[in-house]
C-alpha cells in the first residue's frame, strides 16, 4: 500500500521563488484595472479623515534612493491608516519651478536664457517639467505607492498658482512683505539670490589673512601711551580677502578687554585674550602690553582703510566673539548680515561693489572687471605693497555653496523682496509648540532655526516661476499692491496660468481705472519671481484647503530632516502669517541614506545605489522591507550586503506564508473553523503569540515606529512559527484524518495566523501580501478582491490566557534543554534524526507535577518516546543536567521499528496484520479516514 496517499501532505500553487521583479508589475496592472485607490477611498468614505500631505519632490531627474525611501514610508503610513478604518487619501505632488529646470531648458535650447523671450523659455521649462513628472510618476508607482496618480498637484497648475498669489496677497495685506536693500546669499553662477534652504556647506580651502588698519583718530585716548599714531594699528582677520575693498568699519565687543600690544616697532590693537593665538598663527615676535581698554572705550575712533583714502569707523557689536580672529571684526555692510545690521545702527553706507555675475564694479577702484575670486590675489599684493598685510595662511573651513550648481556663494547687498519673519516670529514659535514632532528633537531644531533666522528673501532673478504680483508706477516708482490688484492677478492666473504675466501688459492685467497716489495710470510689472520655497510652502493653502478629498491642517508632514529649514519651515511661515497656526498636527522626519560604512553617497566614491537597480534585481518589496529594517529617524545604511540580508529575511516570511497556505488547501473557513474553546492548548499558545505581535505592531505603527516591523514579524515567523509551532504541528497536520477535530483545530489556527499575518505585512510587503491574498480561501465576510480592502487585525482579548501562556512558555523553555541533550546524542552517534530518540526525563517533584499536565510530550519534543521518571528515581551518571531547571535528561535510541507512515519508532510496528510496516496509531488514523 502507498501510505503517502493516506497522508495530508502540503500542497499549494503559491511559488516558493518570489521572482518579484517579474511578478510585481503584474500585480500593479491588476491594481490599476480594479482602480484600487478609489476603492479604498470608497470603503472608508464618511469616516474620520487622515491626511498625510505629500511634500513635493523636485521634477528633475530620476528618483534616488532617499526619495524612494521617503515615498515608501508615506505609502506604508497611508495603507496602515486605511486598514485602520480612516479615510486616508494620498494626493502626490511635484515642485515644478526653479533653477534646475531652467538649467535643463538652457541645455535643451542650446542657448542662453536672455536670448529667447520669457514665454518661449518658459514653454521649454514647462515641457521639461512635465516629462520629468511622468518619468518619476512611473518610478513611484513601481515602488507600489498607492495614490491619486492621475490627479497629482503641481506647483505650475493655474489653480495652484492662483492660490499662491492669494497667500502672497494676504501676507502683503498684513504688512509682512517689503522691499529692502540687504545682504543676501547670492550665487554669481546662477545670477540670483538664494534662500537659506538653498545653501549647502562644503569644506573649502581659503585665504586666512591678518590686515592692519592704521589709527587715524584716537579721540585723544592714547595720549601718553604711544608717542604718535603712525605705528598704531587695529588688526582684523578675514577669510574673504575680496571683501576688503568694501570695508567701512571695524567692530569691537563693548565688554572685551582690548590690548595695545607692542610687536617690535609697531603697536597692534586686538582682544587681549586673542594675543597668544594670533602671535602663534601669524608667526609674530614676542609682545609687550602697553595698555588695556574696554571695547566700549574705543568706540568712535577712526582708522585708515589700507587700500583707499577713506576712514574705517570703530564701532561696537554684540556679535563679536573670541572664537577666532583678533576680536576686531572687519565690517563690510554690503557683504554680511551682521555687518549690515550693525552698520545700520551707525548709519554706514551699504556698499556693494560686486555685480550680479560676481565681478567688481567701479565702486571698487583698481579692481573693476575682476571676478571676485580672481581679485583675491591682486588685493593681497596691494595690501603687501601698502605694508598692511600682517600675515597670510590657508585655512580649510565649511563654506556655503549653491545647492543647484554647487558653486561657492557670496553675501551681497541687493534690493530684494522679503517676508518679514520678525513680524510674526513669536506666533511661529508658539505654533511650533502645538505640533507633535517625531523625533522629539525636531521641535528644538526648528525652534532654534525660526528664532534665529533673518527675514526671508523671497525674490529670485529668474524667469521660470510664479511672478511676484507687484506693479510699479512709471512716474514715481512706488510699488502698487492691494486687494484689487491681487484679485486681478489671481483671476487671470486661474484662467491662463502665470504665463499671462509675461504675455500681457500691466494695463491688461490691472483693473480698469486704477491709479497711483501720484495720479499716474501707467504701471510696469515686477520682473522677479518667487522663491520656489514659497511655491511649495503654499501647498497647505493650494492643496489641503482646495482639494475635495483633503482637509486643513494635515495630520502629518513626513520628509527628511533637512526640511526643518526647508518645506516644514516655509509651510509653517506662510501658514502662521496667513492663518495664525501650523498647517500640520504632526511632523515626522527621517535621516539620510548612507552606504554600508555610514558614508554619504557620492559619485566620487562610487557608492550610490539606484532604486531602479534594486527593483530590477530584488524587487520593490525588498526595498520596502529595507525601509523599515532600522530606525529611519537616523541615517539609514544600504549596501548590497544589507540588501542580501533583507532578501533572506523576506524569504523566511515568504516560506512561513507558503507553509500556512500549503496546509489549508482542504480548509473552508466558512465550514471548517472551530471555536477557540475547542482548540488544543498549543494552538491557543500560538494565537497568543500572534496576538502579541498584533498588539506590539499596532502600538509601534501608531507611534510612527515602523522600524519595529521587521523584528516583530521576522521573529514571529522564524522563532515562534517555523522553529517551534509549525514544526510541532506537522505530525498532526499530515498524519491525522483530514477532517479530524485535531487537524481542523490546527488548520483553524493556521488560517487565523495566515489571515492576520497577510494583513500585518500588507502596508510594507504590499506586493507579496497581495499575492498571498490571491491564493487564500476567504470566509464570506472577508472575501475582498484585494488585501488593501481588508481591515487591520484587532487584538483579541480571549487569546490572552495567562494560565496557558505561562504553562507553554515554560515547556518551550525546557524544550531547549531537550534539544541540547538530543544534539549531544547526535554528536555521539546515538541517534540521527530526533525521531530516532527516546527521551528519559528525571525531574524534581515540582517539574514532575508540571509535566503530568501535558499529553503527548513526544510530539512537542519531536521524538518517538518520552519516559517521565518518578522524582525519587536517580538518573544515570551520564545524564544531561539542565542549568536552569532541576532536571536531568537521558537520550537513547527509541525501541521498536520505524513507522513507514509517520517515521516515529514504535513497538507496535509489525503487530497489525493488515499494515505490517506502520504503527498502531497510523493504522487507527487510516481506519478513521476510510470511515468518513
From Swiss-Prot:
L-isoleucyl-5'-AMP binds at residue 559. Binds 1 zinc ion per subunit. ATP binds at residue 603. Signal peptide: none annotated. GO terms for cellular component: cytosol. PROSITE patterns: AA_TRNA_LIGASE_I. Keywords: Aminoacyl-tRNA synthetase, ATP-binding, Cytoplasm, Ligase, Metal-binding, Nucleotide-binding, Protein biosynthesis, Zinc. The keyword Protein biosynthesis applies. Its EC number is 6.1.1.5. Zn(2+) binds at residues 899, 902, 919, 922. SUPFAM superfamilies: Anticodon-binding domain of a subclass of class I aminoacyl-tRNA synthetases (SSF47323), Nucleotidylyl transferase (SSF52374), ValRS/IleRS/LeuRS editing domain (SSF50677). InterPro entries: aa-tRNA-synth_I_CS, aa-tRNA-synth_Ia, Anticodon_Ile_BEm, Ile-tRNA-ligase, Ile-tRNA-ligase_type1, Ile-tRNA_ligase, M/V/L/I-tRNA-synth_anticd-bd, Rossmann-like_a/b/a_fold. Transmembrane segments: none annotated. GO terms for biological process: isoleucyl-tRNA aminoacylation. It comes from the Bacteria. PANTHER family: ISOLEUCINE--TRNA LIGASE, MITOCHONDRIAL (PTHR42765:SF1), SOLEUCYL-TRNA SYNTHETASE (PTHR42765). IleRS has two distinct active sites: one for aminoacylation and one for editing. The misactivated valine is translocated from the active site to the editing site, which sterically excludes the correctly activated isoleucine. The single editing site contains two valyl binding pockets, one specific for each substrate (Val-AMP or Val-tRNA(Ile)). Belongs to the class-I aminoacyl-tRNA synthetase family. IleS type 1 subfamily. This is Isoleucine--tRNA ligase. It comes from Thermoanaerobacter pseudethanolicus (strain ATCC 33223 / 39E). The lineage of its organism: Bacteria, Bacillati, Bacillota, Clostridia, Thermoanaerobacterales.
